[in-house]
Amino acid sequence: MFPRSGLGLAVAAAVVAYLVLLLAQQLYMSNSSQCTIVITGESVSVVGCVYSEAFIELVKGLKPYYHPLG
């Protein structure tokens, strides 16, 4: 693919390093939990959150979105 020159080896090493870092980032992001709150017209969903007393106080008043038609 590349001739055996310093530039070709440097490009190949940079591509390999980029792919390794990209894989490490994907593994790190998939292991970390994400707190997601989805409010629709029908329900409120809380997924992946740490339920501390302060968090419960913040979200206990959430209600589905109401928008009258017409």
Curated annotation (Swiss-Prot):
GO terms of biological process kind: transport of virus in host, cell to cell
Residues spanning the membrane: 5-25
Side Lumenal, residues: 1-4
Cytoplasmic side: 26-70
Domain of life: Viruses
Keyword Kinase: no
Listed GO CC annotations: host cell endoplasmic reticulum membrane; membrane
Location in the cell: Host endoplasmic reticulum membrane
Keywords associated with the record: Host endoplasmic reticulum, Host membrane, Membrane, Transmembrane, Transmembrane helix, Transport, Viral movement protein
Tagged with keyword Transmembrane: yes
Family recorded in the similarity comment: Belongs to the Tymovirales TGBp3 protein family.
Record's function text: Plays a role in viral cell-to-cell propagation, by facilitating genome transport to neighboring plant cells through plasmosdesmata. May induce the formation of granular vesicles derived from the Endoplasmic reticulum, which align on actin filaments.
More details: TGBp1, TGBp2 and TGBp3 seem to act together for cell-to-cell propagation. TGBp1 is the main movement protein that physically cross the plasmodesma with the viral genome. TGBp2 and TGBp3 would facilitate TGBp1 function.
Name under which the protein is recorded: Movement protein TGBp3
